[in-house]
């Protein structure tokens, strides 16, 4: 059967053939994420995945959805679209592992003013790379043209993931107590939160060329390159730790920084006590604080400050947890603080 084509629809701004071309170009990337649990191919009405319950007494599915926010604006100005998909996957899978779950499948949604097949395929290339890093399958997606609603050269990107965890292994902070140790897993940079403030600080909307500047603090990188560093995906090292260590809490440090996200994994009447001098903050954050005149409190209440994820473990297992992290892709993981009596986050 010939591919359908509607001259009337194309005249209204939706090119069906561009959609077909996008799918053909992205197939090679999607194929990298497929595994023995995937049933059927690309193009069906739904993504099929055969759940293997071997090893699970009572499997529980956990889902998460997120987007990349206005980091997309930086990608559009830089005309670099092949890593922003990693951010999309990271924002979703890093959330579900906070419950101790292994991500299984991922789906993406792209809305655009005009479907440029090469650009769409590049975006999906990044999504597929993120799925490979997270060891989950890209089983479906949607690309929607929105003529008249979005400028032709703009797009939005969001994703959705489903993971699985044994019910008895869902992370609980019930045994969290004073003396437990908080471990930091470093970020690659700003990740995917706080970009509305980043854009304001550097006046990016009015002066997009600033993204091509090379501030001395960034060691030869352009500002745009530093800001587009993909969000780190912590799935594999964290799952390794969960196999051998009693993890009492995990927080993905996203919008709201330390003050909003660390308390989400704390037991009532427990406080995260962190010495600010122990936080290994990259130069990019110091540059933003200086240029924007941002208070230290607002920095820690907006950005990850170089810490993308924190794990709370018993003091006697902290060294073992670090050893596992160091051997599984997190060589720079370190002790960040301790649990004390109280509530919230205490930065001293």
For each predicted feature, which ranges?
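Glycine-/charge-enriched secondary-structure boundary and capping motifs
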Residues: 2-12, 119-134, 150-157, 207-211, ...
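N-terminal amphipathic/basic leader segments beginning at the initiator methionine
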Residues: 2-37
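Residue-level signature of catalytic and energy-coupling elements of molecular machines
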Residues: 15, 66, 179, 252, ...
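Hydrophobic face of alpha-helices
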Residues: 23, 121-124, 195
């Amino acid at each position: 059967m010939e591919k359908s084509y509607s001259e009337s629809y194309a005249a209204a701004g939706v090119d069906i053939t561009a959609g077909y071309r996008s799918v053909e170009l992205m197939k090679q990337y999607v194929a990298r994420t497929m595994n023995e649990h995937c049933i059927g191919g690309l193009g069906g009405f739904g993504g099929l995945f055969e759940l293997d319950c071997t090893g699970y007494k009572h499997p529980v599915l956990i889902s998460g959805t997120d987007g990349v926010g206005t980091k997309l604006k930086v990608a559009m100005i830089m005309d670099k679209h092949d890593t922003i998909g990693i951010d999309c996957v990271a924002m979703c899978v890093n959330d579900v592992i906070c419950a101790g779950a292994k991500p299984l499948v991922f789906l993406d949604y792209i809305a655009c003013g005009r479907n440029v097949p090469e650009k769409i395929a590049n975006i999906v290339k990044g999504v597929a790379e993120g799925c490979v890093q997270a060891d989950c399958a890209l089983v479906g997606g949607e690309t929607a043209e929105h003529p008249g609603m979005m400028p032709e050269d703009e797009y939005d990107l969001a994703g959705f993931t489903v993971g699985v965890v044994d019910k008895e292994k869902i992370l609980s902070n019930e045994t969290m107590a004073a003396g437990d140790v908080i471990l930091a897993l470093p970020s690659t940079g700003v990740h995917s939160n706080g970009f509305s403030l980043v854009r304001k600080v550097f006046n990016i909307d009015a002066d997009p060329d600033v993204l091509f500047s090379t501030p001395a603090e960034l060691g030869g990188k352009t500002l745009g390159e530093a800001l587009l560093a993909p969000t780190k995906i912590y799935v594999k090292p964290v799952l390794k730790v969960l196999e051998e260590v009693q993890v009492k809490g995990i927080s993905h440090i996203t919008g709201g920084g330390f003050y909003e996200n660390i308390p989400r994994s704390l037991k009532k009447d427990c406080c995260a006590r962190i010495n600010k001098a122990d936080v290994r903050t990259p130069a990019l954050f110091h540059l933003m604080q200086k240029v924007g005149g941002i208070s230290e409190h607002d920095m820690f209440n907006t950005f990850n400050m170089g810490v993308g994820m924190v794990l709370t473990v018993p003091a006697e297992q902290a060294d073992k947890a670090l050893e596992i992290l160091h051997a599984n892709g997190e060589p720079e993981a370190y002790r960040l603080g301790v649990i004390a009596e109280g509530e919230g986050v205490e930065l001293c």
